[in-house]
Amino acid sequence: LEKFHETNYRQGQETQGIKKEIFYWALEFATEYEFDNNSFIYKLKHKIADKLVYITIRENFGVLELIVSGGAAIQPRLARFFNCLGLRIFEGYGLTETSPVIAVSTNEKGGRKVGTVGPPLAGVEVKIDSANNEILCRGKNVMLGYYKAPDLTAEVIDSEGWFHTGDTGKLED
């Protein structure tokens, strides 16, 4: 996503005059994208930016309508940019030990929020260790243990069955 954004930015820099100004305005507008902003002025600005800039960028994606990311957190500016273009970004979180997803954003109202990964999947429990803000989870998706390594398993799965991810986080409503 970063490289695609950079490529489009460079292409915009090569334009001249009013086209360049409109391009920069549309990019700036995209960095302020809000999922649930329904004001008339916001919608009008978005429609103008879409007709003048975003539609051309979106053509590079063909029929692609959504992107699911889970390898690393997406920078908020990129998440806003691609969502503003009309390419829905869904962020997920998990580890190999959790087969591999714990939580993923959804398409429901309020289900996607920049900088978050969404609610836990059905059947997955998540909590935050108050001592160090570590993300803990348990569910049928979590491994039973490391193969022939009970000592390693005991380091990451406690007596109540909570898998300690080693990552820090927080829960939001």
Question: Where do the language-model regions lie?
Answer:
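Conserved ATP-binding/catalytic segment of the ANL
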Residues: P120-D129, N133-D173
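Short, intrinsically disordered/low-complexity patches at protein termini
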Residues: A103, V114-G115, E160-G161
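Gly/Ser/Thr-rich phosphate-binding loop
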Residues: E2-R112
